[in-house]
Amino acid sequence: GVYASKIEHYIPDKDKKFWEKLYKIVKRLDGLQFPIKRGSREIDKHFGYFGFRYHPIKHKSNYFHIGIDIPNRTGTLVYPIASGIFEYSGFNETNGKYVLLSHPEIKTEDGFVLYSLYMHLSKFTVKFNRRQKFLREISFHTYPLLPIEATRALGRVGKTGNIHGTISHVHIQMEFRKKDVIVAVDPLLFFGMKTKENKSIEIETPLAFS
């Protein structure tokens, strides 16, 4: 079914040694790639890094951003971070048009599997047909399994969903999942890129930002 934006995420900040080791292992994997191939690879310095920020839509301070935002031109192709299994594509008011993949070959020793989520797309280019969607529902999302190669575009950068007043970008979210437990992780560390603190972290009111 639909990816629920209300799912609770657990942030891996209690056992830094474990997560640092995991990041190092994953970024050495073959086939891991940045989702944008053309245009800027820069992250929105005010609101787009993984971590605490001021939420530009909800107008809340000290809000934890569980992904990264990559500004780019509307229509720029978005690719998967690695080959995986297509789980869902759809639309909701928060995510806009989005695509969800699982990566069963990337998992922890205790069974947490990596998932990647691509949000605010202007369009998605992968979806289930009616028969496939029916089979997914009656099989509790276990059949059919549709492989997605890393070379296949998932969609295009856009402004759909709850991003009013912000520029076109794609939001990338990476999570390790096991049953009902979902742990959000910093996508930048998977690509060996430097993560930073959002510049909006100290904003307390909308008037404090210019």
Task: Indicate where each model-derived feature is located.
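Surface-exposed, glycine-biased beta-strand/turn segments
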Residues: 1-98, 106-107, 149-150, 159, ...
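Intrinsically disordered, low-complexity coil segments
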Residues: 37-44, 56-61, 105-110, 129-145, ...
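Short amphipathic beta-strand/extended segments with alternating polar/hydrophobic composition
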Residues: 47-49, 110-111, 116-121, 183-192
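Short alpha-helical segments in extracytoplasmic peptidoglycan/chitin-binding modules
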Residues: 70, 118, 154
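Disulfide-stabilized cysteine-rich extracellular repeat microdomains
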Residues: 75, 123-126, 162
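Zn2+-dependent peptidoglycan hydrolase active-site motif and core
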Residues: 80-143, 167-171
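Conserved, short, structured surface segments that act as functional micro-motifs
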Residues: 97-103, 137-210
